[in-house]
Regions:
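Conserved active-site and SAM-binding loop architecture
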Residues: 1-142
Length: 142
């Protein structure tokens, strides 16, 4: 099996890396700022590099990965949130993931990442189509 590598943004407790590792995919790095979740991820993946604050990560300078996963903050997207969408103070961090993906693509001649997986609430479908089209990215049909 090829060595498929994964990077996780807004990593939390490392659910994406854990699931991926059970499928033979190797988690390489993660970005998270909360200490408690990082301690859990370090226990499961002691060799995974922790990049810290997503706003300070340069996607062109980190190790390229085949897959980038992210579950950006949903406070402004959720049913109980204020529904200000991707313009909201917390949910707008979503754009940091897109920036990192684009920086990595630019640095690798569009080879990496091959796949980006975003997890969030159902309201996000109303916000995302415009962003995906603007960035020439595909989206699964509803």
């Amino acid at each position: 099996m090829p060595d498929i590598k994964l990077g996780s943004l807004f990593d939390g407790i490392g659910v994406f890396p854990l699931a991926a590792s059970r499928c033979g995919i190797r988690p390489v790095w993660a970005s998270e700022i909360e200490k408690a979740p990082i301690s859990i991820t370090k226990r499961h993946f002691p060799d995974m590099v922790h990049l810290g604050d997503i706003t300070k990560v340069d996607g062109g300078k980190i190790p390229p990965v085949h897959i980038i996963t992210f579950g950006s903050p949903c406070q402004n997207l959720s049913l109980i949130g204020n529904r200000s969408g991707l313009a909201g103070a917390k949910s707008s961090l979503f754009y940091q993931a897109f920036r990192i993906i684009q920086e990595m693509r630019d640095a690798t001649d569009n080879l990496y990442p091959a796949i980006a997986v975003w997890e969030n609430g159902s309201y996000v479908l109303k916000c995302i189509r415009r962003v995906m089209n603007r960035n020439q990215l595909c989206i699964a049909p509803p």
